[in-house]
């Protein structure tokens, strides 16, 4: 099927989503796992009310967290709870697998107004 080439499966890079309301998902390792495995851990968090819910005067909020390690702040975990988390996670999972850093995210131009923009605005 794959031309006779074996490829190891990186189980830390498999995104997982719960299609609840609101949806939640994660890829990579948790903050606790990062602290056990690495000396330098940086965690960026964002809590916000998505534009859709703000305009509708709904109390629903979203919580996003990015776990980074090392002086370069390589992203090793992304955890999302909120509007569109299920859709947002896939692209960021690919970026994380390719070695993205928090600085790479900060250098991106955000699409506004979206929940995904919170991930590139976090520090």
Language-model-derived ranges and their functions:
Residues 2-7, 14, 19-123:
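Flexible, glycine-rich terminal cap/loop adjacent to redox cofactors
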């Amino acid at each position: 099927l794959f031309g006779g080439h074996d490829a190891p499966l990186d189980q830390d890079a498999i995104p997982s989503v719960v299609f609840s309301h609101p949806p939640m998902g994660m890829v990579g390792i948790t903050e606790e796992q990062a602290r056990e495995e690495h000396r330098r851990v940086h965690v960026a968090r964002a809590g916000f009310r998505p534009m859709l819910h703000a305009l509708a005067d709904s109390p629903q909020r979203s919580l996003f967290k990015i776990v980074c390690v090392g002086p370069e702040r390589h992203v090793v975990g992304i955890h999302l709870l909120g509007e569109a988390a299920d859709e947002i996670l896939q692209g960021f999972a690919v970026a994380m697998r390719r070695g993205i850093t928090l600085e790479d995210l900060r250098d991106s131009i955000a699409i506004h107004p979206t929940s995904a923009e919170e991930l590139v605005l976090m520090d």
